[in-house]
Amino acid sequence: MADRLTQLQDTVNQQAEHFCNAIGVIQQTSLPSKFVNFERIGPQTPIPCPPQEDYAQLFAQLIARCAKDIDTLIESLPNEDSSIELQNSSLKRLEIENQGTARDLEEVVQKGELLLEKMQYSLECIAQAQLDMQITLKHDLQ
């Protein structure tokens, strides 16, 4: 549960980052507004900065994707309606399933160890046979 909450917090933080970045790009690329009774100091016509990319589309996609991720994570959290009995029965079921899987794993490990022993014995036999052949060849060549 804490893992999902951490993911949710990270995603919410990422969404906040997207909003801040979008506002920053808007500030950089937009033209300043004129206010009544306010004299501007400096150049009267600001030089517009042409946007390099379609930032509106990019940030819209990022924000929408992040919102979907947040919804998915929220949906994956457990309900408050689930009773303690229901949670306990789920835990018991998972524990029984885990025990069965552990037994299966032990059997597979035992079979693997037997196969390993057989393979090691076979490799020893092959190595011994090769040594015997080399000795025989040396005696035959002499």
From Swiss-Prot:
Subcellular localization(s) per the UniProt record: Nucleus
One CC-aspect GO term: nucleus
Record's keyword terms, sorted: Activator, Coiled coil, Nucleus, Transcription, Transcription regulation
A Pfam family matched in the record: Med21
Any one Gene Ontology BP term: regulation of transcription by RNA polymerase II
Keyword Transcription among record annotations: yes
Coiled coil: 87-111
GO molecular function: transcription coregulator activity
InterPro entries per the UniProt record, alphabetical: Med7/Med21-like, Mediator_Med21
Subunit: Component of the Mediator complex, which includes at least MED4, MED6, MED14, MED17, MED18, MED20, MED21, MED23, MED24, MED27, MED30 and MED31. Also interacts with MED7 and MED10.
Annotated function: Component of the Mediator complex, a coactivator involved in the regulated transcription of nearly all RNA polymerase II-dependent genes. Mediator functions as a bridge to convey information from gene-specific regulatory proteins to the basal RNA polymerase II transcription machinery. Mediator is recruited to promoters by direct interactions with regulatory proteins and serves as a scaffold for the assembly of a functional preinitiation complex with RNA polymerase II and the general transcription factors. Required for activated transcription of the MtnA, MtnB and MtnD genes.
Protein name: Mediator of RNA polymerase II transcription subunit 21
Higher taxonomy: Eukaryota, Metazoa, Ecdysozoa, Arthropoda, Hexapoda
